[in-house]
């Protein structure tokens, strides 16, 4: 191969070779792309162990589906990073679903002595405070918070839904969370 590692033409050729089952091509493809894939996955998952495991799953999928790659639909790196992002987000969702299942099971199977009336009053007060603080945000900040936290969307999905740049969404979320924290701390 000629040119710098990771060039689209080089990766294209490697994917064709991987589709034919050539292990050396797979090793070269991995060497050229693993840093970017792992970096993307680690940013989404924020856990080294899960990131390594997910990266391994992604490359296993590359080995199995290299023949499905269509060069007319995008570059090999875009195909790979899209696959990586989807797999990482799926992992986040699976972990969240597992945690929620465990929480529901634990809540349903633990009988704690508690004052139901007091707990209900406290929960109602907390809900009221959160609603008041949400009302103090700008409409765009509130919309971002609602989509991400109540709608379960990732920042990228919020960006797509609102047709707004991802960095703008991140800024709005940061400002909104800071505003909520300040409001809740003050009340």
From Swiss-Prot:
Keyword Acetylation part of the UniProt annotation: no
Region annotation (Sigma-70 factor domain-2) ranges: 30-96
Region described as Sigma-70 factor domain-4: spans on this chain: 133-182
InterPro entries named in the record: RNA_pol_sigma-70-like, RNA_pol_sigma-70_dom, RNA_pol_sigma70_r2, RNA_pol_sigma70_r4, RNA_pol_sigma_r2, RNA_pol_sigma_r3/r4-like, WH-like_DNA-bd_sf
CDD domains: Sigma70_r4
GO biological process: DNA-templated transcription initiation
Known DNA-binding region: 155-174
Pfam families linked to this entry: Sigma70_r2, Sigma70_r4
PANTHER family in UniProt: ECF RNA POLYMERASE SIGMA FACTOR SIGK, RNA POLYMERASE ECF-TYPE SIGMA FACTO
Note: Extracytoplasmic function (ECF) sigma factors are held in an inactive form by an anti-sigma factor until released by regulated intramembrane proteolysis (RIP). RIP occurs when an extracytoplasmic signal triggers a concerted proteolytic cascade to transmit information and elicit cellular responses. The membrane-spanning anti-sigma factor is first cut extracytoplasmically (site-1 protease, S1P), then within the membrane itself (site-2 protease, S2P, Rip1), while cytoplasmic proteases finish degrading the regulatory protein, liberating SigK.
Role, per record: Sigma factors are initiation factors that promote the attachment of RNA polymerase to specific initiation sites and are then released. Extracytoplasmic function (ECF) sigma factors are held in an inactive form by an anti-sigma factor until released by regulated intramembrane proteolysis.
Name this polypeptide is given: ECF RNA polymerase sigma factor SigK
Organism in which the protein naturally occurs: Mycobacterium ulcerans (strain Agy99)
């Amino acid at each position: 191969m000629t040119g710098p590692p990771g060039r689209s033409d080089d990766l294209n050729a490697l994917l064709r070779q991987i589709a034919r089952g050539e292990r050396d091509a797979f090793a070269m493809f991995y060497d050229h792309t693993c840093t970017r894939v792992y970096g993307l996955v680690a940013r989404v998952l924020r856990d080294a162990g899960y990131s390594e495991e997910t990266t391994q799953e992604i490359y296993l999928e590359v080995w199995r589906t290299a023949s499905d790659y269509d060069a007319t639909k995008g570059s090999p790196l875009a195909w790979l990073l899209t696959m990586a992002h989807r797999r990482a987000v799926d992992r986040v969702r699976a972990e969240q679903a597992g945690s929620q299942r465990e929480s529901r099971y634990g809540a349903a199977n633990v009988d704690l002595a508690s004052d139901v009336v007091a707990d209900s009053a406290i929960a109602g007060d907390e809900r009221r405070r959160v609603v008041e603080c949400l009302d103090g945000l700008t409409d765009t900040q509130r919309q971002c918070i609602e989509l991400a936290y109540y709608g379960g969307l990732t920042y990228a999905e919020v960006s797509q839904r609102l047709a707004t740049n991802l960095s703008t969404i991140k800024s709005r979320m940061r400002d909104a969370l800071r505003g909520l924290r300040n409001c809740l701390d003050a009340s």
